[in-house]
Curated annotation (Swiss-Prot):
This is Ribonuclease 3. GO terms for cellular component: cytosol. It is found in: Cytoplasm. Mg(2+) binds at E70, D143, E146. It catalyses: Endonucleolytic cleavage to 5'-phosphomonoester. The gene is rnc. Gene3D superfamilies: 3.30.160.20, Ribonuclease III domain (1.10.1520.10). Residues 9-25 have a biased composition (Basic and acidic residues). Residues 265-276 have a biased composition (Acidic residues). Its main location: cytoplasm. Its cofactor is Mg(2+). Residues 31-157 form the RNase III domain.
């Protein structure tokens, strides 16, 4: 009679430990890290979908992408930010509220929040996007962040999604109120330089690095004078940073002049009245 040798179940498991299991363990650990940063534990399949870019889906047999969740998250984000601005600025007209919202809900701002979460390292990307620096592309980071917000809404409800949006975006909401035009730094700078009679800003941009990993440096100049510089992974990002730097520099100088004038009036009001 031929005997059979039975292999203990645990030994079988150890012997047949596939790379897929190791990959699943790594993914679970990665998701735990992201969930810790978000402050919420989500249903696993939902989080996976939120992190699945269409390039990965197409290269892997047409898996579900994060685009529907992105659509949902965009609406949740817009609602929470709009509600906050409406309550925070009771005297602002609709047009100005819309500009403030646009300063918060845009690809550049969302990408910066995504970078703060190191979201790029968790995204499932196709090989093509991976090879062209997709993990740091503003559009991909912004879309994925909206998808994650959508996933939190579906899994945890509106209160949880609202809390997450406030935690991630309240600093930007506060910052948006300090923008001159309330839309973006380039618009703000142009309005400020017009008010101060300085002329129209121009941007000188240089680039360094290989094609797939370029770094852009921009200088914001007004009337031939450089007021600020900025760097970024895109020309637009570098120009925005340069515009912000220039805006703050020109605004500070204008505030100093206004303060000096006010001090002079306080010191000798009669002379100030005569001059007027």
């Amino acid at each position: 009679m031929r005997g059979t040798v039975s292999v203990p179940k645990k030994a079988e498991d150890a012997k047949a430990d596939p790379p897929a299991k190791k990959k699943a363990d790594t993914q679970a650990s990665s998701h735990t890290l992201l969930e810790g940063r978000l402050g919420y534990q989500l249903e696993s399949a939902l989080l996976v979908r939120a992190l699945t870019h269409r390039s990965y889906a197409y290269e892997n047999g047409g898996l579900p992408t994060n685009e529907r969740l992105e659509f949902l998250g965009d609406s949740v984000l817009g609602l929470v930010v709009t509600d906050t601005l409406y309550r925070t600025h009771p005297d602002l007209p609709e047009g100005q509220l819309a500009k403030l919202r646009a300063a918060v809900v845009n690809s550049r701002a969302l990408a910066e929040v995504g970078r703060g979460l190191e979201l790029g390292s968790f995204i499932r990307l196709g090989r093509g996007e991976e090879g062209t620096g997709g993990r740091d592309k503003a559009s991909i980071l912004a879309d994925t962040l909206e998808a994650v917000i959508g996933a939190v809404y579906l899994d945890q409800g509106l209160d949880a999604a609202s809390e997450l949006v406030h935690r991630l975006f309240d600093p930007l909401i506060e910052k948006s109120s300090n923008l001159g035009a309330g839309l973006d730094w380039k618009t703000s700078l142009q309005e400020l330089t017009a008010t101060e009679g300085l002329g129209v800003p121009e941007y000188l941009v240089t680039e360094t690095g290989p094609d797939h990993e370029k770094t852009f440096t921009a200088a914001a100049r007004v009337g031939g004078v450089s007021y600020g510089t900025g760097t970024g992974r895109s020309k637009k990002e570098a120009e925005q940073q340069a515009a912000e730097s220039a805006w703050r520099s020109i605004r500070a100088a204008a505030d100093e002049r206004a303060k000096a004038t006010a001090d002079a009036v306080d010191a000798d009001p009669d002379e100030a009245s005569a001059s007027a």
